[in-house]
């Protein structure tokens, strides 16, 4: 069975966060999102809205399509 999209998105977000040298707390502060929410998203435990994906993409200096292109 194909890997859950939530897991793939979470892995992508974690990889970007680590590449930027950010902790989950730093990422949450920079993006204005809750740390525990982001932690759950990174683990593939929560769905993420398109609005929050756009916030995250902008926070990393990416377009939404670029953010999701490696998912």
Predicted feature locations:
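Short amphipathic helical patch at the helix-1/turn junction of helix-turn-helix
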Residues: 7, 18-19, 47
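Short, basic-rich loop-to-helix N-cap that marks the start of a DNA-contacting helix
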Residues: 45-58, 64
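Short basic helix-loop element that most often maps to the first helix and adjoining turn
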Residues: 11-30, 55, 60
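Short C-terminal boundary/hinge segments that cap the last helix of small helical domains
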Residues: 61-71
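A detector for short, charged/polar N-terminal pre-domain segments
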Residues: 1-8
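Recognition helix of helix-turn-helix/homeodomain-like DNA-binding domains
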Residues: 32-46
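Conserved hydrophobic/aromatic packing and binding residues within compact polymer-binding modules
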Residues: 13, 27-28, 38-41, 67
């Amino acid at each position: 069975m194909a890997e859950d999209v939530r897991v793939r998105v979470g892995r992508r977000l974690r990889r970007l966060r680590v590449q930027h040298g950010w902790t989950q707390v730093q990422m949450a502060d920079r993006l204005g999102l809750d740390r525990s929410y982001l932690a759950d998203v990174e683990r593939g435990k929560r769905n993420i809205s398109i609005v929050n994906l756009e916030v995250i993409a902008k926070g990393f200096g990416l377009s939404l399509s670029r953010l999701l292109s490696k998912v």
